[in-house]
Amino acid sequence: MKLYRVIVLREDKENLERGVWADRMEIKGESILFLTFDADNMEDRLVGLYPARYTIVTSVETKEEYDKRKGTI
């Protein structure tokens, strides 16, 4: 599991900053998909969907890196 930090650029409003926990990220067409593997159903589950043209992934960190960073604060 990884934490993807993203910024969604918006023309007429303030940009959105989000964090998405997912196993992997895919670019499909005009979208960025964030997916997690659902072991119960043995298939990927969509946990986030953002427009590729207006989204910037600013960082990616593993669960272990996140826990270590949060433990030092």
What are the functions of these language-model segments?
Residues 22-46:
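Acidic, low-complexity, intrinsically disordered interaction modules
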Residues 1-3, 26-27:
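Short, surface-exposed loop and linker segments with low hydrophobicity and enrichment for Pro/Ser/Thr
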Residues 21-27, 51-56:
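A short, sequence-level motif marking secondary-structure junctions
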Residues 39-73:
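Short, mixed-charge low-complexity intrinsically disordered segments
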Residues 8-10, 36, 59:
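Residue-level signal for short segments within beta-strands and strand-turn junctions
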Residues 2-13:
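A short beta-strand micro-motif
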Residues 13-14, 44:
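Residue-level signal for glycine
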